[in-house]
Amino acid sequence: MTTDMDLEQLEYEKEVEEIEKWWATPKQSQIKRPYTASTVAVLSEVTKAYYPSSQQALKLYDLLREHRNKGTATLTYGVVDPVLASQASKAGLETIFVSGCLCGLSSVDEPGMDHADYPWDTVPKAVDRIFRSQNWHARRQKQFHLMKPAEERKQLPKYDYLLPIIADGDMGFGSVTSTMKMTKRFVESGVAMIHLDDLAIGLKRFTVGQGRTVVPTSEYLRRLTAVRLQFDIMKAETMLLCRCDTDHAEFITSVVDPRDHAYVLGATTKIESLIKALKDAESTGVSMKKARENWIERAKLMTFDEAVKSTATPKEYENYISAISKKPFHSISERQELAEKYLSNEVFFDWELPRSSDGQYFFKPTVQTVIERAIAAAPLGEMTWARMDYPKWQDIKAFHEGVRAVYPDRMFAFGFTGNYDFKAAGFSEEQLRNLTSDMAKLGVCWQVQPYFTCQVLNKASVDYSNIWKKDGIFGYVKTVQEPALKEDVDGFENEWCGTYFADKLLSAAGSSDKTIPY
């Protein structure tokens, strides 16, 4: 006789088998999970559901793989508005991006700069709104086409309104479980891919250009694992873009992970702590900024390896570097032991002295730092994105070639900022013209301008507001209305507004009126 417990065990074993079979499919087999199928089966949802997110993710995956194989790229921009999303489809874009920064400026009760301090469901809600509008546009287009004769239908334009949505997951908004809840909401909203970064929340000081802080490598991987686990629990094909914001970071929250130790800065002179120096400056009326700069100069901040180099003879340093090259990562204590072994003089190094009032450690990342984090994260996601707000071609090239040395077929993303002066950074006009295609050859198959909505629309709004203010309705008709009517810009057409679709709904629902006896 089969008991309820026996049935439960059989269902569990069947689910484990189904999960393992799913993980063996081409897309899923690339992911290396630190947990088992049995763990997922224990945590999985009891009521099974299929999420449109999976359909969109598979569509996106095939699109990106095709571009990656051809050495080309698909380009898009950041949107938070359903109307703009529909225009991306009309323009022939293949994806759209929902930026957390733009949502934080436009879709919340209390706007703010890019601290990711808005509610965790802000971006999922924006995705949900856009995805619903995409479905509506696809439906009303289908209905309009099918009301026409076959020959006439062939002449009608047809747009792909169901563009896959890539969305900003920021840093996951807190603990593992809050990250998983956010991920669940994203999947339910219809997103095709989300990205998660390695930043610490709310520590940037924008006006002085300081404060970019990353979390330890282990915490970054824990965030990504939480997202992947939630995808698996929901049986979702949703893609994960592993974004690394370590480039130009100044601080790290913790030194718990030996993989980060090579890049942590310490004082190499025996002085008071930075916090004490700043307190003394405050009490005497000295500028905190100047006091900080003075302390950093006196502390002679270096990484431990730099401190070794400044202390050792050339031969001693050569022996030290040879010793630490025998394995990928050495903790600070291992480095200190090797320094004691190979150097005749003591190396003074204290990474506690420079710690900030927020507890941050000074950090000195290099392109190699970003490469190491990206390689560590790659098994958990389908794509990699190294955020470079101040990109230099040699750094872009070095990063992507460094990761491809380990993962030759890796797909990459890249985001362009809205205020970076490419000319001042040494890019010629010809280099800038070819930048998109040159990066595509490095495997960067998805490229985005996240701040499009702010920069382009703000500029257009000011330009046309000035015309309206100066020339009134005459200016509007001449500069907006007449060109829009000539160019078939969406706005009030019966088809785009869904009037035919609405009338069809009314007609279908009113079919029973024919049965009313008169």
From Swiss-Prot:
Its function, per the record, reads: Catalyzes the formation of pyruvate and succinate from 2-methylisocitrate during the metabolism of endogenous propionyl-CoA. Does not act on isocitrate.
SUPFAM superfamilies in the record: Phosphoenolpyruvate/pyruvate domain
Q: In which pathway does it act?
A: Organic acid metabolism; propanoate degradation
- What Pfam families does the database record attribute to this sequence? ICL (PF00463)
Where it sits in the cell: the answer is: Mitochondrion matrix; Cytoplasm
By its UniProt entry, which InterPro entries does this protein fall under? ICL/PEPM (IPR039556), Isocitrate_lyase (IPR006254), Pyrv/PenolPyrv_kinase-like_dom (IPR015813), Pyrv_kinase-like_dom_sf (IPR040442)
Gene Ontology molecular function, alphabetical:
isocitrate lyase activity; methylisocitrate lyase activity
Question: What's the name of the protein?
Answer: Mitochondrial 2-methylisocitrate lyase
Q: Which gene name belongs to this protein?
A: icl2
Would you identify the family this protein belongs to, as annotated? Answer: Belongs to the isocitrate lyase/PEP mutase superfamily. Isocitrate lyase family.
Q: Which reaction does it catalyse?
A: (2S,3R)-3-hydroxybutane-1,2,3-tricarboxylate = pyruvate + succinate
Organism per entry: Schizosaccharomyces pombe (strain 972 / ATCC 24843)
Q: Which keywords appear in this protein's UniProt record, sorted alphabetically? A: Cytoplasm, Lyase, Mitochondrion
Q: Where does it primarily localize? A: mitochondrion
Under Enzyme Commission nomenclature, its number is 4.1.3.30
Matching entries from PANTHER family are given as: BIFUNCTIONAL GLYOXYLATE CYCLE PROTEIN, ISOCITRATE LYASE/MALATE SYNTHASE
Q: CDD domains under this entry?
A: ICL_PEPM
Q: Name one GO cellular component term.
A: cytosol
